[in-house]
Amino acid sequence: MNVGHVVQVIGVVVDIRFPPGQVPDIYNAIKITSDKEDAFGRKIDLTLEVAQHLGNNTVRTVAMSSTDGLVRGMKAVDTGAPITCPVGRPTLGRLVDVLGQPIDGKGPIISDKRYPIHRPAPPLVEQSTKAEQLETGIKVIDLLVPFLKGGKIGLFGGAGVGKTVIVMELINNIAKQHGGISVFAGVGERTREGNDLYREMTEAGVLDKTTMVFGQMNEPPGARLRVALTGLCLAEYFRDEEGADTLLFIDNIFRFTQAGSEVSALLGRMPSAVGYQPTLATEMGQMQERITSTVKGSVTSVQAVYVPADDLTDPAPATTFAHLDGTVVLSRQIAELGIYPAVDPLDSTSRILDPLVVGNEHYQTARGVQKVLQRYKELQDIIAILGMEELSDDDKLVVARARKLQRFLSQPFHVAEAFTGMSGKFVPIKETIRGFQEILDGKHDDLPEDAFYMVGSIEEAVEKGKKLLG
């Protein structure tokens, strides 16, 4: 057993000296346990991660929980391996922290397998080169922002526009339609939101297909920096060992960067642009490159991205953009119209909205919808000033169809049934394309626009329209 002792404590950074020739490797986990109590009366049981070798047999480590109660001279034991977390089926339906320890009060997780949180990305020969769409059953996403299986999607939105509801619906649909597994990593967000999500998912009945990992705002930066990797290693197990199509949700990827910035400053590194860490691109790349499809299975990630001061050129979101295959932009203006999911059909983009991947029919329909909605956007100023009467007959038709398309992009969600009173709908991609194409072709010009609001397939809209017309 390799035992050192604490020589310096600066906040969450702890320097530990080991005997000559026994200095632990970078990323090794160090344990400090003591019967001495901290300020809250808890016995000290602390895990730290080696971040730097300082020379003179001393290492600088970053703590994964509070360093309250630590004193110089305390014994520190090198575990000889990186931080590991339990993986596999026993973790489903459970809530864990950065170290894989349960925090849901349901007892220990009994798993015979543990994965290190630091793992290399899959080699190129094992990666799948096939571009394939992941069917989500959400019309606006499947049509305009198709998700790449094994890809990375950014979810951009302010407070209260429905990020969490979309996340929950995706978890629900993947679990029920594909038998898929989801991992939710809460990185540096509000504890209340994590609690709400846990309760809502329990009520919606999707928790047994999900593992949740939390490192919240009140945790030290070391935990917030590593919790995304804990979530990722849980997802990698299901991909590599069970061949599952796994969904990884990270909320919020900006907090991962923010925690990295705090740790970097504490380690004494020279800051780079806007005060961020000089290793920003490396840290982001090491994590994002592990999120990919292999010949065995896939890890598809949906990452909520907070944009500081709405500045997309800020180094944190700008570095994230480089890795994304698609961006789903949630708009407050659309939410105010009562159209949910409040996805902006003109701002959202996907790399695989390409006729070679999704097929020509899908591509032409999606572009047709965007063209009509763009024209409607251009005409809105004229309508506001002069009214509909001043438009040409062609433009009146465009406006009528655009308003129907806009409403048809809304959809009742399974996880929101308790609030909307409407049963949720899963719409297959073929049905989605056919419905929008029929509206573009003018087959439903006779129906009122309310018929298209909060329905699933086009047949439901026609039926609702007939009822409205009496």
UniProtKB/Swiss-Prot annotation:
- EC main group: translocase
An example GO CC term for this entry is: proton-transporting ATP synthase complex
Q: Which reaction does it catalyse?
A: ATP + H2O + 4 H(+)(in) = ADP + phosphate + 5 H(+)(out)
Signal sequence residues: none
EC number(s) reported in the record: 7.1.2.2
GO molecular function annotation: ATP binding; ATP hydrolysis activity; proton-transporting ATP synthase activity, rotational mechanism
Q: Does the keyword Cell membrane apply?
A: yes
Q: Which CDD domains is this protein grouped with?
A: ATP-synt_F1_beta_C (cd18110), ATP-synt_F1_beta_N (cd18115), F1-ATPase_beta_CD (cd01133)
Q: Which InterPro entries match?
A: AAA+_ATPase, ATP-synt_VA_C, ATP_synth_F1_bsu, ATPase_a/bsu_AS, ATPase_alpha/beta_chains, ATPase_F1/V1/A1_a/bsu_N, ATPase_F1/V1/A1_a/bsu_N_sf, ATPase_F1/V1/A1_a/bsu_nucl-bd
What's the protein's topology in the membrane?
A: Peripheral membrane protein
Binding positions for ATP?
Answer: G157, G158, A159, G160, V161, G162, K163, T164
Q: Does the keyword ATP-binding apply?
A: yes
What keywords does the record list, in alphabetical order? ATP synthesis, ATP-binding, Cell membrane, CF(1), Hydrogen ion transport, Ion transport, Membrane, Nucleotide-binding, Translocase, Transport
Localization (cell) = Cell membrane
Q: How does it assemble?
A: F-type ATPases have 2 components, CF(1) - the catalytic core - and CF(0) - the membrane proton channel. CF(1) has five subunits: alpha(3), beta(3), gamma(1), delta(1), epsilon(1). CF(0) has three main subunits: a(1), b(2) and c(9-12). The alpha and beta chains form an alternating ring which encloses part of the gamma chain. CF(1) is attached to CF(0) by a central stalk formed by the gamma and epsilon chains, while a peripheral stalk is formed by the delta and b chains.
Family per record = Belongs to the ATPase alpha/beta chains family.
Which purpose does this protein serve, as stated in its record? Produces ATP from ADP in the presence of a proton gradient across the membrane. The catalytic sites are hosted primarily by the beta subunits.
User: What is the name of the protein in this document?
Assistant: ATP synthase subunit beta
Question: Mind giving the lineage of the organism this protein is from?
Answer: Bacteria, Bacillati, Bacillota, Clostridia, Eubacteriales
